[in-house]
UniProtKB/Swiss-Prot annotation:
The active site is at residues 126, 298. Residues 193-206 have a biased composition (Acidic residues). GTP binds at residues 303, 319, 347-349, 462-464, 532-537. It comes from Danio rerio. SUPFAM superfamilies: (Phosphotyrosine protein) phosphatases II, DNA ligase/mRNA capping enzyme, catalytic domain, Nucleic acid-binding proteins. Disulfide bonds: none annotated. In the N-terminal section; belongs to the non-receptor class of the protein-tyrosine phosphatase family. This is mRNA-capping enzyme. CDD domains: Adenylation_mRNA_capping (cd07895), Mce1_N (cd17664). Pfam families: DSPc, mRNA_cap_C, mRNA_cap_enzyme. Residues 186-227, 575-598 are annotated as: Disordered. Keywords: GTP-binding, Hydrolase, mRNA capping, mRNA processing, Multifunctional enzyme, Nucleotide-binding, Nucleotidyltransferase, Nucleus, Protein phosphatase, Transferase.
Amino acid sequence: MSQTGAPPRWRNCPRRGQPVAGKFLPMKTMLGPRYDDKVPEENRFHPSMLSNYLKSLKVKMGLLVDLTNTTRFYDRADIEKEGIKYVKLSCKGHGECPTAETTEMFIRLCEHFIEKTPTELIGVHCTHGFNRTGFLICAYLVEKMDWSIEAAVAAFAQARPPGIYKGDYLKELFRRYGDVEDAPAAPPLPEWCFDEDEEEDGEEDGSASAPASEPSSSHTGQSKKKKERLKLGAVFLEGVSVKGVSQVTTQPKLGEIQRKCQQFSEWDRSGFPGAQPVSMDRKNIRMLEQNGYKVSWKADGTRYMMLIDGRNEVYMIDRDNSVFHIENLEFPFRKDLRIHLSNTLLDGEMIIDKVNGQPVPRYLIYDIIKFSGQPVGQCDFNRRLLCIEKEIISPRFEKMKLGQIDKAKEPFSVRNKPFFDIHAARKLLEGSFTSQVSHEVDGLIFQPIGKYKPGRCDDILKWKPPSHNSVDFRLKITKVGGEGLIPQTVGLLYVGNYDMPFAQMKITKDLKQYDNKIIECTFVNNTWVFMRQRVDKSFPNAYDTAMAVCNSIQHPVTKEILLEFLERCAQVQSRKNPADSDLMPPPPPKRSANSIPQ
């Protein structure tokens, strides 16, 4: 491993657990500021963060035991200046359990400290704070506090889930302090063990020998992706029942679909590969005059990619990377309607239109990445829009006219979403357009005309009225209060991988049902206000996303600012392309009862 890089699998490993037996705080190693250029801000763990955490708990740590085999991770002076005694107790790890001598030294050290200062915590860390750390804490609980080894292992697992996850460590603990036959099976490896973009060519503590640690069976040299998460019971399109849709949960089919979508999108990481827009602010709005853009309305829909891979092989992929099989949805080949499309990947959103008071689900296609194996995502956006209309929508319409597609059997309708030149934004916001759309419109999307880019895309801008700006948080309801104060129930709001709350909100009786759920909140009168639960998401917004939204709240791009800026852009564009200045956005197509819907 590079001497300047973070340890393997460290980045998304939880920073710390909860106190064990009121005495020990297990944690991973901290990394000093010298690693900041290697570690994203939301993943950092400086010594100062430990100090702030202890202050928030109103507890004091008097001793920190460092079990790693290196001194490069942080400066011990940053610990000692907080009045915490630092002790280095090197412990190999990597397939070697702590020796009897090391265990005895740890126990004597902690026993001596606790006798002198029984009210102060002892911090313990190895590289990740699970196996070596858990082993020695459990040994102390058994030898000095008369715990059974079963109770000690269970208590550590509860305080630092999933606990000790190396089977040989568990067996050695039970061999020393119980019956090795009673040793529990090692728990499944935690998700962070499968982190992508981690170096694997050296020991976690920075020495040069080859790694002997997990996860060898799942983390091959060919792929450094995280293990894909499986969300059982995923909901397809909240609020309406859609026939013929079922979640794909069996392997290898699930993995094959996920990998195909990632490969088609040229996404070399795990998770959902779709392009993600960023919030418009007063800085990035200038990209609209520097680059070519198209605009469309922002529907309050649910994001899905669609993989078309043959007859009865149509799949939808949501932002949690959950996969749904869609029955009775046909996509014929334009040049021969008897042939079904395959190797085709679309991007779009499911919306719920209101037609005669009844909910009607529709899929709006707004981009295409692959068509019959061809990388159309590399083409400019105008050509991709043409491809959607000509190769996806029109062949379906032709086959409907021939009576060869039974619309009544399809689970939902499929349409292409139109995009316009940016000067049409005023019509989209102020004209009769919104009244002619049968679903909720909550802003605008500005799409660059360049090639498709997977993941977060700083070029795709979403604009919402300042009153609609929102953040998706993970809500954790807890009681807070110091000595002599009445405990109060508050909602702590978390983003990204941070284990410190980003903000907090007042908790009502109705909000208690959303504990540990993802909720969308807006900022009103200097407080975060609940909008809705996001059942389509399992993770909160990233820290950078939340900060961008906060910036847009503090320095909003109002409708007036936006339209005035676009007016100037349109004048520049019309001088370059006079013929385009006459284009106006048509209203969404209104179809008669006798016409065939797309």
